[in-house]
């Protein structure tokens, strides 16, 4: 799809080009109480009051998400007008904007419209300018058009008719909106990669598949890729990671991707993604119902790869390192057993009380490995705990950090990106739950505050740099009829890096 930006001040009569320009459809907003948006007023005047008459006749009442097509409207160049209900004007919000935009795209995608003029980005969203509206609209469109059919015998290769979208924006926002459009496309491409990796079955998206994906990213985007195999992982004494991997016939991989957008001496931001390509629970076997969704236990890895792809496409002036420890967690005669004690790369011994708490066992060695980069910050991303779903549901990602400044940056990025996160506690008192009679610490801390104690475990291996942990167990994928990977938290991570890069 092609996206272009044009400045237009509807209040100053500069909309002639939009009124007379040829397109298949122009999209206008209508508030409840028969109130037209600025663009709709101009179109209504050019059409000699047709829009007003349609509203007064009750064909569209302005309720949020309602849509109505008008055909062959005189006085304008577009062959159709799409009216979109915006709800109550005094209650118009970011969520209302997103809902209206989603309704518009769904209506348009059900037609053979090829070129659209889109005016909704200029709507008065509190604390937002046109550039934000453009970015949100592009991401919404890409989300609506995403489909995963690669594994079907007859994949759906059809593309939507919609090819060209012209956004009208406030003239003062035109430059920023062009940047926002490019960032949105890069971000959507990164999210699509994350979703594709998550949606692939575990017999396809293996650790080796993830490693090959990283190598392809390096080739396509000028990154440096280091993929460490079993012997190299053993040489690094990552025995905690290997204790999880040994129960599977699939060989483990330790992936390191480097993106250099700043001076070589500049400290990088390191992203660490959990890459359990299938999690059976190991000897502490999970229930059979819903176990198919454990292919999504590598969504942390997928989001890290998707983020670095987006960063490379944006060309951000920042250095980023992506680390992915990846393996399967399977039951076998040589698999981890409850009560086993393993030694981490850091040297701390860990009593494995539950083999289904394996994510922290692979992440702890990756967090130790990250020290060699002398990072500006380290953020790990993992589908780590069901307890986080109990605490936060499926809307907010769990955020843990002892660094208030870093946590604040991530929360700001989450709000800007519309990819919400919620900070949870990481008090030292919770560490007591991880005490072991036989090792330096246990890999679980009991049922109370399960997501907190998991983060506390990781914090023991992240003491030498600013660190944050994102628990995406509730936000990385959806179940039910809409089952599939979401692409989160790529928007949050990318926005954090955009902000860090000053882009």
UniProtKB/Swiss-Prot annotation:
The keyword Metal-binding applies. The gene is pepA. Disulfide bonds: none annotated. This is Probable cytosol aminopeptidase. The lineage of its organism: Bacteria, Pseudomonadati, Pseudomonadota, Betaproteobacteria, Burkholderiales. Mn(2+) 2 binds at residues 274, 279, 297, 358. The active site is at 286, 360. Its cofactor is Mn(2+). Keywords: Aminopeptidase, Cytoplasm, Hydrolase, Manganese, Metal-binding, Protease. It is found in: Cytoplasm. It comes from the Bacteria. One of its GO terms (biological process) is proteolysis. It is an enzyme of class 3 (hydrolase). One of its GO terms (molecular function) is metalloaminopeptidase activity. Its main location: cytoplasm. Its EC number is 3.4.11.1, 3.4.11.10. SUPFAM superfamilies: Macro domain-like, Zn-dependent exopeptidases. It comes from Burkholderia thailandensis (strain ATCC 700388 / DSM 13276 / CCUG 48851 / CIP 106301 / E264). Mn(2+) 1 binds at residues 279, 356, 358. GO terms for cellular component: cytoplasm.
């Amino acid at each position: 799809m092609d996206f272009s930006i044009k400045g237009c001040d509807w209040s100053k009569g500069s909309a002639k080009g939009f009124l007379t320009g040829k397109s298949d459809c122009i999209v206008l907003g209508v508030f409840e109480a028969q109130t037209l948006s600025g663009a709709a007023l101009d179109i209504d005047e050019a059409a000699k009051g047709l829009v007003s008459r349609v509203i007064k006749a009750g064909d569209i009442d302005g309720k949020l998400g309602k849509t109505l097509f008008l055909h062959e409207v005189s006085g304008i160049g577009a062959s159709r007008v799409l009216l979109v209900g915006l709800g109550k004007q005094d209650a118009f919000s970011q969520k209302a904007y997103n809902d209206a935009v989603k309704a518009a795209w769904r209506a348009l995608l059900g037609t053979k419209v090829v070129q659209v003029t889109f005016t909704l980005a200029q709507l008065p969203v509190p604390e937002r300018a046109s550039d934000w509206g453009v970015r949100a609209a592009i991401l919404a469109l890409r989300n609506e058009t995403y489909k995963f059919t690669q594994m079907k015998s007859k994949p759906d290769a059809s593309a939507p008719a919609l090819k060209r979208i012209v956004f009208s924006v406030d003239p003062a926002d035109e430059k920023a909106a062009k940047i926002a459009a490019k960032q949105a496309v890069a971000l959507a491409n990164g999210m699509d990669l994350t979703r594709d990796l998550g949606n692939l079955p575990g017999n396809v998206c293996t650790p080796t598949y993830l490693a090959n994906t990283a190598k392809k990213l390096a080739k396509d985007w000028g990154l440096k890729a280091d993929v460490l195999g079993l012997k190299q992982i053993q040489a690094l004494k990552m025995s905690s990671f290997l204790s999880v991997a040994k129960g599977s016939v699939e060989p483990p991989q330790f992936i390191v991707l480097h993106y250099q957008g700043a001076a070589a001496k500049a400290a990088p931001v390191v992203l660490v993604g959990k890459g359990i390509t299938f999690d059976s629970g190991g000897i502490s076997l999970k229930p059979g119902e819903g176990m198919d969704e454990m292919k999504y236990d590598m969504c942390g890895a997928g989001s890290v790869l998707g983020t670095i792809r987006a960063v490379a496409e944006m060309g951000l002036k920042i250095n980023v390192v992506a680390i992915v420890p990846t393996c399967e967690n399977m039951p076998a005669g040589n698999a981890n057993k409850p009560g086993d004690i393993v030694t981490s790369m850091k040297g701390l011994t860990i009593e494995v009380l539950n083999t289904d708490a394996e994510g922290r066992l692979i992440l702890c060695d990756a967090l130790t490995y990250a020290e060699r980069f002398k990072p500006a910050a380290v953020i790990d991303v993992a589908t780590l705990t069901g307890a986080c779903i109990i605490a936060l549901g499926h809307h907010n990602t769990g955020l843990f950090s002892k660094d208030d400044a870093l946590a604040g940056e991530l929360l700001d990025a989450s709000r800007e990106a519309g990819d919400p996160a919620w900070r949870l506690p990481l008090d030292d008192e919770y560490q007591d739950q991880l005490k072991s009679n036989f090792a330096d610490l246990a890999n679980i801390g009991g049922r109370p505050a399960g997501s907190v104690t998991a983060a506390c475990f990781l914090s023991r291996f992240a003491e030498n740099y600013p660190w944050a942990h994102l628990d995406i167990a509730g936000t990385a994928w959806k179940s039910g009829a809409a089952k599939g990977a979401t692409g989160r938290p790529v928007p949050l991570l990318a926005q954090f890096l955009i902000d860090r890069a000053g882009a």
